[in-house]
Amino acid sequence: MSTSPSRRTLLATGSALGGALMIGGLPASAVARAADEEPVEVTASPDAWKDVLDDADMVWQRMPRTWYEGPYLGNGFLGSGIYAEPGAETRAVRFNVQHSEVQDHRPEFGSLFGLARLLIGHFTLEPVGTITGLDWRLGLQDAELTGTITTDRGTLTIRAFVHATRSVLAVEVMPSAGERDFRWVFHPADAISPRTAYVTPPAGYRGNPPAEVADHDGVMAAVQPLLAGGQHVTAWRDRTRGAGRTLYVSVAHSHPETTALDRALKEVRVDSEIPYNALAAPHRAWWHRFYRKSFLSLPDARFQRFYWIQLYKTASAARRDAPVMATSGPWLEPTPWPNTWWNLNAQLEYWLIHGSNHLELDAVTRALSEFRDNLAKAVAPQYRGDSLGIPRATDMKLVDIVSGFDYGVGVPGQSRPTPEVGNLTWALHNVWLSYRHTMDESILRDVLFPLLRKAINYYLHFLQPGSDGKLHLPATYSPEYGGNSRDCNYDLMLLTWGCRTLLESAELLGINDELAPRWREVLARRAPYPTDTNGFMIGADIPYAKSHRHYSHLLAVYPLYELTGHTPDERALIEKSLAHWVSFTGALQGYTFTGAASISALLGKGEDALRYLGQLMGRYIQANTMYKEAGPVIETPLSAAQSLHDMVCQSWGDVIRVFPALPGAWRDLVVHDFRTQGAFLLSAVREAGRTRWVRLVSEAGAPCVVRHGITGPIDVRDASGTSLAYEEATDGAIRVAIPKGGSVLITAQGDRPDLSIRPVGPNAPAPRWGMPAK
């Protein structure tokens, strides 16, 4: 990211770029304005989405027994994971009731206990007979579970969804004659931090009182009072229509008020008056619109299905106005991590929203802005006037307090609280990505710049010159490695990106900031990233010498793209560091392999990226594409979708790279309306191992440099078919001016390919996700 004052001017004007102006592969001066051709239009049939989504449906012909095997439904707030009732696998099916806003409110016990998300409870669907079989399908296109449960007394035909825009779970059951007396039973959970099952709680901590279940004029409700005040409420009604019954369930949470009961009862009363199909219609329409914002088809059937399931999962777990996803999204299960985690998880959870063109799910930008006052309270009192931070784990309002302190982010050079300082700057990189992919200046002006300024200011309090004349950081903590180190790479890399971004942002916003000289000084004088013969170290005092799942010591490579291998020495350093990182076994986890895949994609190594993702699939991803360690964690499969994005398109450094890291087996590939930095929508088709065409639509009129990957002379045309002037850049890229709302189409010279968007054929068959029959 350049900080030159003339950078935007240089990118926007051909006269200063030094490349020859071209039309149709010839100098513009030698070519008259090309005659208008037929308008060029990229077309996509709705069947394209239907085909890939139907193909990606998860199926179950065997009973799922855990959260990482069964179907899941959600809308960013309300969720339900579905599987056999433990200990009664042939007698009942569990429908969990989960909600991302339901948490405790006792900060004196810290975020992991006193502010933990709380289990709510579950329904059991209890047939008359013994369950002997099932046939379920989670239809991605409609976000709806359908199928049958077979017993020795008959069948239960079910349909279920969590409404996309209403706070209701609806489950319709059509029983055969022998199963007419099936029943629903609600089982409230203990309202206590799930972490208590793994770690001894602080002294004085106890669970909340039991829930109170009562009938409210035909609507049942389980009211869970909270010791801190407030309540969460599960309300439900089992409504009979004709031969079927529909269960309507809603959850509400309030603190410190006790208004949740009225809200939950009202939701159920309103929704239960609506027949299932009528209630489902707007829900299905929402999902159809959601998917059609982008398209990706690749010839590996297993990976293509996995990708579309991650989009389904993300839209089930996230909304802009919902809490930032906790470690398990809305689907809370027993876990030692019942909060939102900020030293990797939250960042990875939201990466895929950018390329897939789903910024409507960006809760990170909204939450950091809305709760910025709590970010000030996260640092020690003497720094709150000009600094911000975010602790490792927080509740939905970004609050955490470490026992014995009134703040959660440690002080560099001090051991307690743990000086894990870089988390907010890393989270703000997600905000920067949202700005860059939309070019929405309000994000830059109102959120990124003011928050990043104070996040970096926290570092500036502690930088000190050494005997070498460089600026050094006192000891800080690199997530999860163990031990504090001076000049920790996690922090130096984020500090460097932050200062560079602040300088560029100030220029774009026209701000003459008094701190700009200090930011420039940091870039000029900060200590070099500590390295040894094996590559990047954890910090100056700690080599990378044991198995470690995090890539926090490699952030300058990915995702910051501060180091990209643009020189042979830099490339060798990245390759050496990557190889050394993954060479230690024992503590590696799933996101180790997504990080390794994305770093490989940066280096253009598509085969390596595919190999790392293959290891992830074979060793870590579960039957329903969920992922587990000591408890459920959602970030790794979602970040694997981002690794696929990184293989298909990269747009760091003001260059759009089309198909930069595809493995040889992916000879056919289609991408449509893929969002890139600069607010471009990319559509491109690869056939028989070569790129046939590239189309870019500009939403902001930003400068456009694209490495299109088409061999030989090219034609560049606008939407009307008129040839456009362009300039040759470096490494096979061209520079072309696209006005806001305009588009360009790039093809081989004289080639007029079919511009339809349709799925590619698979190289080989693959089993569906879920639990199909063996």
Predicted feature descriptions by range:
Residues 35-68, 73, 77-340, 359-362, ...:
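Acidic/polar, glycine-enriched structural segments that form the non-catalytic walls/loops
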Residues 180-189, 697-711:
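Surface-exposed beta-strand/loop patches in extracellular or lumenal glycoproteins
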Residues 1-5:
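Secretory targeting signals
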Residues 164-173, 679-705:
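Carbohydrate-binding surface patches
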